[in-house]
């Protein structure tokens, strides 16, 4: 049992056993450990009030860094609903240390020395909740939670004593009977149902405490379905430190909240508006304060583990990102995961909380019928699905999934027919308290997240169908033009053709001139395959592929395209020697299943045998005939098998090597 002093009332209140509290709260609830650091969100706290919260002109920040001083686990005297009181003390922003945990806390936000106590929850059926009926006990619960039953008796029967959240003891008769035989609670069950006002859909929780006592608790059902109704499932921290839960808001409630500056929790909240204002006032003054959290009734958690919030806000969120999110079912019997796409990134209440990350993400669900009212979520409650790409951008996508446009006018038509999006920027990067953290993230890591597939969330088959069936485009413009909102820059130096890059907020720089021109669209290379020819033009130079960069120059007009991925750096930091961005004698090596290649210096090798040994060492592949599994692309774009020409010629022309993972993979694109 936990007894925590309550300075606000000047007395001692009896707390509930934390293990029984968590069993009643549900499997998705995670409380922050003692001495851990959390962010307190007054905006979220206001949503838990049962009347309007008017902060007036108080200079309340959107989030306050705090340390957890005390946690008190309690239960409502009337409904048995569990809740917790947290005592927090504000900290200065400079007191935050990354990867810092509280005493006894592991990286997942739990107390590392705690062991899970066996418990079992069952959703009551109509028969279980009937007045005068009995309770059908699942076999697992009867054999693992209940005291051992003597099956040699006829009939096997026992009296069990169960202690509820208030310490009251309930007596039940447990019998094993029927055809087929089953475990039942008979005498004493009807009285328990009537006293606790249980209905079908509520859950009964049995737990065996560490001291051997049998405990019983209640988990009231959420009315209205998954993500619906006034009561939403909420969790303090992600399970396993990687995923989060439902901090949800209906679209109509969100609009009314912004219009009236009132809490959406009218007639649904559990705390008073005065207590919310008092807590926020104490927080901004740097004094300790207390908040109350109802895990089964609150719309969302408003004290978030600092590490989770920081990690979520380091991500440069943008529309099109794919994620998954966990929800507790209506009867709280299981946890289900749902896939979704970020549709927009903007502040939920720009007037009162202009810099708040609270409900920053507008989302669209793959199963909208089940989650039709869930329009906004907090970024720390979702898990990015980084290994699921709506558009496969690997270097070895099958040829049937590549789109090649043979004529130059078609390319202009393509650019002209695709609506150019305005890439949403993270509104918190410069204006929020998290900006200092975001500034420390390497630019290369930020840019790596901005892939074309993340903006659109389309599969390659969808795009292929679109291009085959799209209506005829308007006549092509005289020159290729892209929206300035993409940050496209043109640099022409005398008669030399420059580079074309999409800049994502990087510092402009003077790029080394190249004799070859290229274009990069949405961060991916467009590789022409045919020579551009215009009437009266004498320029017949081939346009070759070059590296991806975060900054550069632009050249209009190409013939075809090919999507590929690259991990090359900015041209500001290295000299470009040829169309591939590599010095002569260097090439990129890719495994068939990988997106990112490695740079190999061929000039230090003297034969194909040395090349075979080098590749085996680089990728840990032991093949007796390595060269038979290696394809390469030369400077002219031709694809050949390694070993078909003298090594000296191979050394001069090889620009890209691909190691086939299976023999006979002839459909691989190099």
From Swiss-Prot:
GO cellular component terms given for this protein: nucleus
General function of this protein: Auxin response factors (ARFs) are transcriptional factors that bind specifically to the DNA sequence 5'-TGTCTC-3' found in the auxin-responsive promoter elements (AuxREs). Could act as transcriptional activator or repressor. Formation of heterodimers with Aux/IAA proteins may alter their ability to modulate early auxin response genes expression.
Compartments, as annotated in UniProt: Nucleus
Assembly description: Homodimers and heterodimers.
Protein name as annotated: Auxin response factor 16
Compositional bias annotation for Polar residues: 545-557
Region ranges (Disordered): 545-579
């Amino acid at each position: 049992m936990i007894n925590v002093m309550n300075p606000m009332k000047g007395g001692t209140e009896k707390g509930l056993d934390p293990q029984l509290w968590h069993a009643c709260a549900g499997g998705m609830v995670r409380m922050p450990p003692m001495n851990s650091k959390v962010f307190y969100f007054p905006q979220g706290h206001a949503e838990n009030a049962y009347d309007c919260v008017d902060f007036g002109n108080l200079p309340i920040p959107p989030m306050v860094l705090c340390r957890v001083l005390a946690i008190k686990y309690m239960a409502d005297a009337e409904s048995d609903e569990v809740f917790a009181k947290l005592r927090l003390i504000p900290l200065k922003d400079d007191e935050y240390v990354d990867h810092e945990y509280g005493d006894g806390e592991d990286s997942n936000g739990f107390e590392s020395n705690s062991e899970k106590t066996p418990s079992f929850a069952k959703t009551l059926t109509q028969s279980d909740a009937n007045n005068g009926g009995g309770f059908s006990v699942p076999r697992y619960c009867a054999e693992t939670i209940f005291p051992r039953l003597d099956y040699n008796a006829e009939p096997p029967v026992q009296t069990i004593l169960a202690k509820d959240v208030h310490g009251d003891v309930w007596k039940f008769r447990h019998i094993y009977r029927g055809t087929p035989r089953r475990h039942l609670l008979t005498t004493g069950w009807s009285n328990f149902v009537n006293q606790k006002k249980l209905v079908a859909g509520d859950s009964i929780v049995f737990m065996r405490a560490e001291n051997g006592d049998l405990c019983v608790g209640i988990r009231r059902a959420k009315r209205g379905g998954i993500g619906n109704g006034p009561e939403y499932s909420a969790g303090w921290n992600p399970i396993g430190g990687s995923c989060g839960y439902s901090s949800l808001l209906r679209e109509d409630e969100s609009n009314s909240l912004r219009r009236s500056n009132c809490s959406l929790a009218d007639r649904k909240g559990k705390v008073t508006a005065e207590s919310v204002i008092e807590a926020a006032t104490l927080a901004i003054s740097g004094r300790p304060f207390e908040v109350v959290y109802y895990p089964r009734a609150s719309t969302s958690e408003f004290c978030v583990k600092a590490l989770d919030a920081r990690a979520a806000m380091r991500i440069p969120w943008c529309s099109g990102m794919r994620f998954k999110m966990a929800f507790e079912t209506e009867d709280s019997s299981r946890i289900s995961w749902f896939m979704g796409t970020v549709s927009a990134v903007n502040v939920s209440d720009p007037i009162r909380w202009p810099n708040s990350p609270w409900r920053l993400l507008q989302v669209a669900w793959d199963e909208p019928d089940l989650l039709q009212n869930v329009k906004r979520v907090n970024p720390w409650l979702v898990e990015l699905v980084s290994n699921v790409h709506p558009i496969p951008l690997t270097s070895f996508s099958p040829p049937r999934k590549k789109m090649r446009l043979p004529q130059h006018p078609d390319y202009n038509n393509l650019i002209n027919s695709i609506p150019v999006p305005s890439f949403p920027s993270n509104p918190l990067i410069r204006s929020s308290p998290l900006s200092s953290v975001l500034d420390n993230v390497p630019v290369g890591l930020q840019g790596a997240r901005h892939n074309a597939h993340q903006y659109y969330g389309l599969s390659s088959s969808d795009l292929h169908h679109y291009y085959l069936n799209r209506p005829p485009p308007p006549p092509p413009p005289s020159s290729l033009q892209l929206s300035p909102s993409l940050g496209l820059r043109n640099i022409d130096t005398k008669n030399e053709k420059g580079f074309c890059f999409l800049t994502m907020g990087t510092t402009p720089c003077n790029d080394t001139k190249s004799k070859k021109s290229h274009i990069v669209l949405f961060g991916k290379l467009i590789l022409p395959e045919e020579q551009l020819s215009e009437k009266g033009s004498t320029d017949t130079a081939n346009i070759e592929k070059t590296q991806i960069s975060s900054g550069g120059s632009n050249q209009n007009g190409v013939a075809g395209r090919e999507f590929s991925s690259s991990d090359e750096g900015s041209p500001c930091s290295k000299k470009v020697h040829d169309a591939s961005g590599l010095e002569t004698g260097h090439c990129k090596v890719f495994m068939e299943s990988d997106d990112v290649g490695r740079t190999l210096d061929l000039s230090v090798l003297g034969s194909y045998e040395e090349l075979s040994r080098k590749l085996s060492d680089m990728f840990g592949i032991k093949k007796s005939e390595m060269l038979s599994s290696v394809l390469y692309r030369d400077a002219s774009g031709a694809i050949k098998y390694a070993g078909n020409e003298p090594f000296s010629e191979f050394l001069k022309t090889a620009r890209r090597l691909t190691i086939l993972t299976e023999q006979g993979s002839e459909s691989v694109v190099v």
